[in-house]
Amino acid sequence: MIALLAYGQEVAKVGHIHQKVRLKGEKTVTVRMLVDTGATYSVISPLLAEKLGIKRPRRSVRVRLADGRRIRLGADIAIAQVDGREAPTTVLVGKVDEPILGVEALEALGLVVDPGKKRLTPSRPYAVRLGGYR
């Protein structure tokens, strides 16, 4: 966590927000993910993809990284569950230090970052889905 100072006074603490997420593919895994509002899509490691039963991602997509480089990553769909909410979301498979929860998943789940409380909060009411996704 980083403390921001103004004239020697601490005015804010800036840190990363992590969230426990249950991901469902062919198999289900609960994982701690870094919430990244600068990432459009969620990104998981090949090992986590394998644990979800994603042996070969359905698609390959070209993405631009934060440093400007463009690379191809595998892409598939998983069901994300957070705090009683669930929604299908795109997961990219690539080398990451920790799993990333991107904006597409947050929007699908109806969640936003509350920086003051350092957690996710609802952005809208959530309607429970009774049908399947596929």
Question: Model-derived features: where do they sit?
Answer:
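Pepsin/retropepsin-fold aspartyl endopeptidases
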Residues: 1-134
